[in-house]
Amino acid sequence: MKARDIMDAMDMLDQDLIIEARSGRSIKSHGPRRLLISAAVIALVMILAFTVVAVSYGSDWFAAFFSERSGRPLSREDMDRIGANTAQVGKSQVRDGYTITLESAFTDGKRAFFRFLLTAPEGTALDADWYGSPELSSIVNERGEDLILDSEGFYMGGGGWRHIHEQQENEITLLYTIDTFYTGERSISDTVWIFYIDGLWKGYRDEEEGRRTEQLSEGVWSFEIRFPEGCEREVELISEPVTVLGVLGGAPLDPAYQMDPVDILSCRMRALTVEIYYRSEKKEGINADFGVIYAVMKNGEQIPLRRHGTYPDKINYLFDAPIDLDQVEQILFHDGTVIPVESVS
């Protein structure tokens, strides 16, 4: 399986967690917590997380990662912009002989990537298929707010671990990806956040015995992080409703299915994500599908956005690599409808 395929699958996994999260379970918490994921989800994590991506290290780590992820080279300007919006941390903690270092993180306020270095005790080989925790990590700020919980304690996001790169026998790079679809007014760059890792596990795939996990430590690692100011910049593209054709009812976007007019009420674009809020008078409360949409850049390049969750009033889309909001000219839909970026604020 290619790195691109596994990245796509990991996004599907994140969405599974988000769907589960929106089921209404309240889990108020202000620190480390054990939120056990179902056995099926753990198995899916293990299947999808085993990949080695050839990336470089240092200040351009995320630039190299996003270039690999998107399958296209990034310009020097893109790399500089990604570097300026990357939080460099470099803090380590040791529990039961295992050192975890939070190296850096990148976010647009809706999707976040945290890069960790895991170092095992000398003489211990990190040769399992998967490392991390089968529990959602807790990320809280100084005010007690959780990155993926709303004020009532309900899930508004999800996340998962990914094995990225092996440095040497007892060192590997891990990536934790998280989505947060918190809809209230909240800034993430004006406060210090604390990332908790509650326990360390390893996992194996075995064709005969199936998948199995083993706990390496019951310790809790915690890291403070402050995101760069301006990383969560958002542009609203809609001043009045725009009508496009979509398929209602969750059916695949295909000419064989009837397409109905859907009013787009809001189109909020960030470096990694686009949130589209919509309404259909014909079938209220029914999910819509607009298929693949594109960000058309000023240089003519069309960058596809991948759907990442559909709800009765909203669709979330993802970019494979952060875009420069100042260089986006318009959003293009499958039916030819265009939402221009008239002014960027």
Indicate where each model-derived feature is located.
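Single-pass transmembrane signal-anchor helices and their membrane-water interface zones
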Residues: 10-12, 33-70
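Disordered, charged N-terminal biogenesis/targeting segments of membrane/secreted proteins
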Residues: 1-31
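Short, charged N-terminal helix-start/capping segments
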Residues: 22, 29-38, 104-111, 267
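Alpha-helical, hydrophobic structural elements that either
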Residues: 53-345
